[in-house]
Structure formats: structure tokens, C-alpha cells
Amino acid sequence: MVHEPSPLQGTLRLFQTEPISLPYFETNAQHPNKLIFIPGLTDTMGVVPYLPSLASVLNDLEYSLIQFVKCSDLGGFGTSSLEGDAQEIAQLAEHLLTRSDSPCTGKLVLMGHSTGCQDVVTFLSEERLNLKTGQQILVHGGICQAPVSDSEYFDSHDGSQNSARELLSKSQECVKKGLPGALLDRSHISPVRTSLKGRGEGNSATVLTPAF
């Protein structure tokens, strides 16, 4: 039996409009403390099942829960970088600290889930400037929940497959040649063409089998 996910109530808005518009969702925006949640590989806003419970606990502690969309979400893995994620998190943090209504005046915390923990470590590995104030973005804490790296995920899920190992070898060769942004052949991913009364699995294959 599939249980319907618990709903979350809050505010949906944009934290940036250039060079691409990116949204975020916040529960209990009136609280001075903010926790930015960063999900793992192929996940995006609202996917992780314990978020309603987390939001409830955070509310008691006068924290709002913030989920956001970044360019590497869903099928963006393999075409993005951890530093790129960190820069988008910095843009979100700057917005939360400087927005006119209910800004972050208390503590700002990052929480990574699974491979999202890599973004927490990358963000905290160097200073991040608040371009609106000229000061360093101050983060009061970083939480790593069930941490795992991309390579560990690969080894536990795809590493035993010959096709995956072949693609990994090709990707390493591209890096050696100075082509870290090169895309590998994705012909092994069969496009979903079947349809029953206009319904099917959509583009889920590109998310469930992301680029290496």
C-alpha cells in the first residue's frame, strides 16, 4: 500500500532571476533562524519523506525549513559541479539574509542529505561573499545526514555493471584530456515511447539514469 506524502504549507518564491530563475519553498517564514535543506542525487524539492517531520521540529525551535531548486537537481547530475551548487546556495543565503520581509536575523544552517552532504562541505570549504553587503556569508552550522559521495554511490549502485564501468573509464579519460564538461554517450538509456491513454513514465529515465 502506497501512503500519500504528508503535505507541507509555506511560501514559494524565487531567490534569483538571473542568469536563470530558481525557486525555493519555505515553511514558517516568520522565524529568524533558517535551515537550508540540500537533498541527494536525482532528488529535488519535496522528495525526501521525513521533511514534514523535520519542519515540525524546526518550528518548535523557531527555525524555518527551506527547500530550493538547483540546476543539478533531478537529471542535472553529471552536467553540473559541486562548486556550481555551492555558488547557487550562496545566492540563496544572500537572498535570505537581505530580503525585505522576514530576513534571516538569527542562525543560518545548512543540512545535506545523502550526496547533498558534498554541497555542504564544498560550500564551507571557502569564504562566500555577500555581494549586497560586502561581508562574508556567515553560516552557523553544517549537518551531514547519511553522507555519501558520488563515487560511493556509484560503487554501491552501478559499479558492478560493465556498461557503467566503461562509461566511468571514458569520463576519466575526458578529464585527463582537459574536457571535464564533455557529455558521454547516453544511447544506453532507452527513451520512453510507450503510452497508454496518453499516460506513461515521461522523462523519468533521464533522471533515474543520470549522466556520469
Indicate residue ranges for each PLM-predicted region.
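Lipid deacylating catalytic domains
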Residues: 13-16, 25, 85-89, 100, ...
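The alpha/beta-hydrolase serine catalytic core
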Residues: 2-15, 128-212
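Catalytic nucleophile-loop/oxyanion-hole region of alpha/beta-hydrolase
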Residues: 47, 71-107
